[in-house]
Amino acid sequence: MDEIVKNIREGTHVLLPFYETLPELNLSLGKSPLPSLEYGANYFLQISRVNDLNRMPTDMLKLFTHDIMLPESDLDKVYEILKINSVKYYGRSTKADAVVADLSAHNKLFKRERDAIKSNNHLTENNLYISDYKMLTFDVFRPLFDFVNEKYCIIKLPTLFGRGVIDTMRIYCSLFKNVRLLKCVSDSWLKDSAIMVASDVCKKNLDLFMSHVKSVTKSSSWKDVNSVQFSILNNPVDTEFINKFLEFSNRVYEALYYVHSLLYSSMTSDSKSIENKHQRRLVKLLL
C-alpha cells in the first residue's frame, strides 16, 4: 500500500530498452488486436472495478469526482523538466524542440451523459475514458510524418492496456534510442493514460518504418482517414520486452484499482452523501 501511495504522490517511470532491428511490420488499419492475459493480467482485475464505475449514472460520477478531477498538466510539466521551449502538433510549426501528439481525453472522464446501468450484464460499451484499448489509434504514429530534426518525440497515450500499445512501444524502441514512459503526479490518477518521451532518433529504422507505412497507406503524407484502430505486428514481441513494459503499467493499474475502489465505496456508501470516510481518504490521496 505504501508503494501505491508513493507512486500516486510522486509519479512513476521506466526506461525501455533500445533494439537495433525493427520487428517485422504488417500494418493493417481498421481493427485493434484483442486483449489477452499475456499483455497484462492486472488489467482484468482492474477492469472489474472500472465496470462498477461504468454502471454509475454520469451525474453522480461528476459529483463524486468534481473535487479530485484536477486539470491534467503533465505534458506542461514534461516540457518544463526537459527545457522544451517550442512544440509542434501535427505540423503546425516548422521549427520546434519537440513534436507532440495527445491521444488522451484531456480533462475528461466519460464519453457521454448516461443514466445508471442495472448490472454488468447490461453493459454494452465502456463509457469511460479508462482502460479502453480501442482509444489507441494510428494517430500514435502521426508525429513521425512531421518529424524532421526535433530533439524529442512525445506522445500522450490514452491507455496502457492491450497488445496494441505494447507493439507500438516496441516499434518506438527501434525508432529512437531513448524511450521512457512516465505517469506523472500531474496526470489524472483516475485514468490509465501516460506519456512516452523518445529521443535520439535512429534514422535508418525511421526511414524503413515510414517506407512501410507509406506503402500501405499509399500516401507520403498524413491523411485523417488513417485515424482509426490498427494492428501492426503479426508476431508477439519478446517476453522480456513485455515484462519490462508491465513493470511500469502494473504499477499504474495497481494504483488505479485502489483509487477506483475508494471512489466506488464512496459512491455506494451507506451515508448516501459525498461526505463519507471513503471520499475523505480519496481527497487526501489525490489532492
Swiss-Prot record:
Coiled coil: none annotated. GO terms for cellular component: virion component. It comes from the Viruses. One of its GO terms (molecular function) is mRNA 5'-cap (guanine-N7-)-methyltransferase activity. Transmembrane segments: none annotated. Its main location: virion. It is found in: Virion. GO terms for biological process: DNA-templated transcription termination. Pfam families: Pox_mRNA-cap (PF03341). Keywords: mRNA capping, mRNA processing, Transcription, Transcription regulation, Transcription termination, Virion. Belongs to the chordopoxvirinae mRNA-capping enzyme regulatory subunit family. Heterodimer of a catalytic and a regulatory subunit. Intrinsic methyltransferase activity of the catalytic subunit is weak and needs to be stimulated 30- to 50-fold by the regulatory subunit, which is itself catalytically inert. Regulatory subunit of the mRNA cap enzyme which stabilizes the catalytic subunit and enhances its methyltransferase activity through an allosteric mechanism. Heterodimeric mRNA capping enzyme catalyzes the linkage of a N7-methyl-guanosine moiety to the first transcribed nucleotide (cap 0 structure), whereas the polymerase associated VP39 is responsible for a second methylation at the 2'-O position of the ribose (cap 1 structure). This is mRNA-capping enzyme regulatory subunit. It comes from Vaccinia virus (strain Ankara) (VACV). The lineage of its organism: Viruses, Varidnaviria, Bamfordvirae, Nucleocytoviricota, Pokkesviricetes.
